[in-house]
């Protein structure tokens, strides 16, 4: 039996930041991950905002930056393009395309430098509550090992089992789980390899197709779809796009990534006695964009700080962990509620309506672009949006 103050399950961005902050604040921390190599295989499009990293004190490192981005291109079903470039418009959400395999590993290294112990190839197999905490049974390098912790932080992704084992209702409803698949491809003929491209409409029911540039002709080309919106698989939709899009029809895959993206909003049941849930496991994903790295990092920071303080207090009850809910609601959740409403509205639109909106957007003059200003412009150009979204601002 291994004893620790805090056990973090999952060494993705949220788990590593939680482990780092908890260790920096004086707690004894163990961070476990089931994979042989932290960060591999990658499971997302790898985009992250510069402002988000800066707010968390994470300095950019060329070793984990694949591409510095300048802007975004939104493409409607009839191929109307809305260009938004950082050279002419302020885009706080502009950022980087990461090498996630390297980024995740560096975040874990920072946790180790802060004092956290790391156990790789360690799979959590069960959990039970005891009077003085939680015991998580694991298989570590083929050997069964129990870890006794006063507090467990569940950072085990959208298929999270830890929160459920601990008695929390933290599973994402099927209708809000996007099915995602992505190729890293070579030979992509991008119109601008410093801008990300997002394709909307029936090409990706319930989601969108993305092209995220990683080099001159290298890009992540992927799709997210809601399975209750289509009879086809995400793979079938993506292959149809790749074969017909001029930018990708001659490209070849060098890697494939698959996974689920919870876009139903932040779960309410994200704390309990002796436990906190962070990152994708807690639904910290922007339902409008599907992006979750920045909010995952932020949720991890708050969880680590709150958990470490609870250790100092000697009180690991749900009541003493509720500051985590307050912090995430204040700094992340208030925006996500608006994004959820906007997502629901966009899902109600036909391709022709998206084309009309894109044509109006293409003529608009933006001073700054972020989800908030885009929603405001949507309300301005679409009477239907005014009815559905007018009360958001």
Curated annotation (Swiss-Prot):
Purpose of the protein: Is involved in the reduction of 2,3-digeranylgeranylglycerophospholipids (unsaturated archaeols) into 2,3-diphytanylglycerophospholipids (saturated archaeols) in the biosynthesis of archaeal membrane lipids. Catalyzes the formation of archaetidic acid (2,3-di-O-phytanyl-sn-glyceryl phosphate) from 2,3-di-O-geranylgeranylglyceryl phosphate (DGGGP) via the hydrogenation of each double bond of the isoprenoid chains.
Name of the protein in question: Digeranylgeranylglycerophospholipid reductase 2
HAMAP family (UniProt xref): DGGGPL_reductase
Uppermost EC category: oxidoreductase
Cofactor: FAD
Note: Reduction reaction proceeds via syn addition of hydrogen for double bonds.
Lineage summary: Archaea, Methanobacteriati, Methanobacteriota, Methanomada group, Methanobacteria
Cofactor descriptive note: Binds 1 FAD per subunit.
UniProt signal peptide: none
Reaction equations catalysed: a 2,3-bis-O-phytanyl-sn-glycerol 1-phospholipid + 8 A = a 2,3-bis-O-(geranylgeranyl)-sn-glycerol 1-phospholipid + 8 AH2; 2,3-bis-O-(phytanyl)-sn-glycerol 1-phosphate + 8 A = 2,3-bis-O-(geranylgeranyl)-sn-glycerol 1-phosphate + 8 AH2; CDP-2,3-bis-O-(geranylgeranyl)-sn-glycerol + 8 AH2 = CDP-2,3-bis-O-(phytanyl)-sn-glycerol + 8 A; archaetidylserine + 8 AH2 = 2,3-bis-O-phytanyl-sn-glycero-3-phospho-L-serine + 8 A
Family according to the record: Belongs to the geranylgeranyl reductase family. DGGGPL reductase subfamily.
A GO BP entry: membrane lipid biosynthetic process
């Amino acid at each position: 039996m291994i004893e620790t103050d805090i056990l973090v399950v999952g060494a993705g961005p949220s788990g590593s930041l939680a482990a780092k902050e908890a260790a920096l604040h004086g707690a004894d921390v163990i961070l476990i991950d089931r994979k042989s190599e932290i960060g591999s295989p990658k499971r997302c499009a790898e985009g992250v905002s510069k402002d988000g990293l800066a707010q968390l004190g994470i300095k950019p490192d060329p070793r984990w930056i694949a591409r510095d981005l300048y802007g975004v291109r939104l493409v409607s079903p009839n191929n109307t393009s809305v260009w938004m470039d950082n050279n002419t418009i302020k885009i706080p959400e502009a950022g980087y395309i990461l090498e996630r395999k390297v980024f995740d590993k560096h975040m874990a290294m920072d946790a180790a430098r802060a004092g956290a112990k790391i156990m790789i190839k360690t799979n959590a197999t069960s959990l039970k509550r005891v009077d003085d905490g939680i015991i998580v049974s694991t298989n570590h390098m083929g050997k069964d090992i129990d870890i006794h912790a006063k507090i467990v932080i569940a950072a085990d992704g959208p298929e999270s089992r830890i929160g459920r084992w601990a008695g929390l209702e933290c599973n994402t409803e099927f209708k809000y789980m996007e099915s995602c698949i992505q190729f890293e491809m070579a030979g992509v003929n991008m119109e601008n390899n410093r801008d990300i491209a997002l394709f909307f409409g029936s090409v990706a029911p319930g989601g969108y197709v993305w092209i995220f540039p990683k080099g001159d002709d290298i890009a992540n080309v992927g799709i997210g779809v809601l399975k209750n919106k289509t009879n086809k698989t995400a793979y079938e939709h993506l292959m149809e796009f790749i074969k017909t899009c001029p930018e990708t029809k001659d490209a070849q895959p060098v890697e494939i990534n698959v996974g689920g993206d919870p876009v139903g909003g932040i779960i309410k049941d994200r704390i309990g006695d002796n436990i906190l849930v962070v990152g994708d496991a807690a639904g910290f994903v922007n339902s409008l964009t599907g992006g979750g790295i920045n909010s995952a990092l932020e949720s991890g920071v708050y969880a680590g700080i709150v958990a470490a303080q609870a250790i100092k207090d000697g009180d690991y009850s749900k009541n003493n962990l509720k500051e985590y809910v307050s912090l995430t609601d204040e700094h992340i959740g208030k925006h996500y509620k608006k994004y959820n409403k906007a997502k629901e509205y966009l899902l109600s639109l036909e391709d022709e309506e998206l084309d009309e909106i894109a044509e109006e957007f293409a003529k608009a003059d933006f001073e700054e672009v972020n989800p908030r200003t885009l929603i405001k412009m949507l309300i301005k150009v679409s009477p239907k949006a005014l009815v559905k979204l007018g009360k958001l601002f």
